[in-house]
Amino acid sequence: MAKLRDLMNTSVVIAGPDTTVTEAAAGMVRARVGSVVVMQGTFLAGILTERDVLRAAASGEDLSVSLVAKWMSPDPHSASPDMSAEEAAQIMLLNGFRHLPVVDGRVVCGVVSIRDLFAAKIRRPARGLAEPG
């Protein structure tokens, strides 16, 4: 059973709630990730995802002045590095989100996406399924 520590992306983009949406989106593009972890000091305050950026863009607001705090999902669910991929997938599916911060103690050490979980499942087919050939 795969653990999140083996699947998570450790290239975490971090922003504060007072970061503009444009700056946060640029960070996602540079790092080639779909989310930004929002920190208030050492506290995990929220997560801003591609979907949130799309909602902000569709609102017509000027994203160069609109702040992450307005669009982020506050107090996000998080997972431990020792959580199984299956448990993380269940949490994500039940709650309707695609990104899950991974926290070791109080430190954000990565983010796992539904794509990461799917890729891990494809790399290790379930028992009883024929290998592609």
Predicted feature descriptions by range:
Residues 2-12, 66-76:
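Bateman (tandem CBS) regulatory domains
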Residues 7, 27, 56-57, 71:
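Amphipathic alpha-helical segments that mediate coupling or scaffolding at interfaces
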Residues 14-32, 39, 79-96, 103, ...:
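The conserved cystathionine-beta-synthase
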Residues 28-31, 36-52, 92, 100-115:
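A glycine-centered beta-loop-beta connector
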Residues 55-66, 125-126:
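Short, charge-rich, low-complexity interaction segments located
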Residues 84, 108-133:
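Cytosolic regulatory modules rich in charged/polar residues
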